[in-house]
Amino acid sequence: MVCTTLYTVCAILFILFIYILLFRKMFHLITDTLIVILILSNCVEWSQGQMFTDDIYYNGNVETIINSTDPFNVESLCIYFPNAVVGSQGPGKSDGHLNDGNYAQTIATLFETKGFPKGSIILKTYTQTSDFINSVEMTCSYNIVIIPDSPNDSESIEQIAEWILNVWRCDDMNLEIYTYEQIGINNLWAAFGSDCDISVCPLDTTSNGIGCSPASTETYEVVSNDTQLALINVVDNVRHRIQMNTAQCKLKNCIKGEARLNTALIRISTSSSFDNSLSPLNNGQTTRSFKINAKKWWTIFYTIIDYINTIVQAMTPRHRAIYPEGWMLRYA
């Protein structure tokens, strides 16, 4: 009788032990699963709050994506143009400038007739093209940069177009301590300032000059002269001594990244050799670079407004913002 009772108690304890063991394992398994699901769901929500994974497609309006964690206005069109074209106010002006004190409101209202939301058009002026390297950050859904074109400025126009239409990662260069080399075709030096006179001396593996004397700057080869902006290319994988006036010009070591697909360039030309294939009136090309042949700035803006669909459809709207230290003109 005692043995039977003992066996019964042992059996009950064994069953209880197995039950508790399995229950605790299941409890921990369920708890761990819920914790993992909670963490993953929060990560997904955070990533969606920081990055737009789907591009916005233009169908006549700038589409709206609301995102409280993103500092940029994602339903905007920024237009950059020279400050010099804003003229003195008054009727009967024939200089071709924007002489209307309410020009910004007028232009924005005309864009609204094309389907843009009220308040989505932002007009910004710049003083000189080198501002786009030094200070201007393009942060709208779409960005249009208007630059006057002339044969005398053809080189700088080509270089600013290369800069504006791509993303660049840059670091300051200390010319008093280091020699520098470019490591590939996407590695260039960006010079900007009031007067960038730059000369270089390539060095061999023993630090002797190749065709120049490192100790004599008069023997250096001139790569930039009397310019406000220059993208300097030298022979890759060769160290160079660099000579320039650091008080009037700054130099950055830059790597070209991806194309800035939400940005287009419009060159204003009065040249008789105008290339009509780039005109928005002729649908333009898919390079996000256009030309308008006009002298009057109201004519220029009227043309941009009328053909904004052609211009915008060549672009892709902003879908993410990158903030790593050293990036100039962050991809917006």
UniProtKB/Swiss-Prot annotation:
Keywords: Calcium, Capsid protein, Disulfide bond, Glycoprotein, Host endoplasmic reticulum, Host-virus interaction, Metal-binding, Outer capsid protein, Signal, T=13 icosahedral capsid protein, Virion. Calcium-binding protein that interacts with rotavirus cell receptors once the initial attachment by VP4 has been achieved. Rotavirus attachment and entry into the host cell probably involves multiple sequential contacts between the outer capsid proteins VP4 and VP7, and the cell receptors. Following entry into the host cell, low intracellular or intravesicular Ca(2+) concentration probably causes the calcium-stabilized VP7 trimers to dissociate from the virion. This step is probably necessary for the membrane-disrupting entry step and the release of VP4, which is locked onto the virion by VP7. This is Outer capsid glycoprotein VP7. Its main location: virion. One of its GO terms (molecular function) is metal ion binding. N-glycosylated. Belongs to the rotavirus VP7 family. Disulfide bonds: none annotated. It is found in: Virion; Host endoplasmic reticulum lumen. Residues 1-49 form the signal peptide.
